Amino acid sequence: MEITHRAAVLGSPIAHSLSPVLHGAGYEAAGLEGWEYTRILCQAEELSRVVRESGETYRGFSVTMPCKFAALDFADEVTERAQQIGSANTLTRVDGHWRADNTDCEGALVALRELLGHTLPKRAVLVGAGGTARAVMWALRELGCEQVTVVNRSDRAAEYVELAQGMDVSFCTYDADLESVALQADVVASTVPADVLKQHADQLGHAPVFDVIYNPWPTPLAIRAASNGYPVVGGLSMLAGQSYAQFEQFTGVEAPREAMREALSR
């Protein structure tokens, strides 16, 4: 079969990426013939060259670390949410130019809705303040969250002014009374490595938990929250969720969500 449309994931390391699994399953389920999705090893400083030298058959690129900031700088057009979050995980060819977007925030929205159902969180705890945390903050805002306590080693409130519009955002360190903070929350969302939170899991596991980690799973935080009777959702839900929007931007076809999500369980 002739390959007429291509997409790929860019980053380093890249061998572990599940994006080909997700998009490949989407192509098959949607009946898209002539589509191919691959991995391309790419450092941040190489992104501009790799994308510019890609052939006309390339419709888009999924972008992972360390290339997310370079993708934002490279693009001819940047979506408002990517600008607010400060990084891009999606580059789509549109009428001969490249548009940067961040669909991680949609992935976080999918995961939070899976976790909470129809319940809208009013108060949240967000662990970490990096790029993934900013995507989760966007999702919390979309859900109408009113108050977010960010647990982080440093106070980065100044960086969140635009993103936090309409929300009361405060910062605290890991030395705070995290159990009290968690007990008052409708959801705890963690964006930091599992080992970072291991010693704080007992304190934070007192609310429904969304942990962006999917390997290893379950994390100590998820285990503690589940043992306390709370629902938990891991990073595979976010990974699948962000891929739906990418798939639709690249192909112009509605994502076959169920088939793509099920592909991660094979």
Language-model regions, residue ranges each:
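Short helix-loop-beta connector
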Residues: 117-123, 205
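N-terminal Rossmann-fold NAD(P) dinucleotide-binding loop
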Residues: 133-134, 218
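Rossmann-like adenosine-cofactor binding region
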Residues: 165-234
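Phosphate/diphosphate ligand-binding glycine-rich loop within oxidoreductases
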Residues: 2-116, 216, 228
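Glycine-rich Rossmann-fold phosphate-binding loop(s) that bind the pyrophosphate
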Residues: 12, 128-130
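Adenosine-phosphate binding glycine-rich loop
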Residues: 212-266
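Conserved S-adenosyl-L-methionine
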Residues: 142-147, 228-230
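NAD(P)-binding Rossmann-fold cofactor-contacting core
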Residues: 145-167
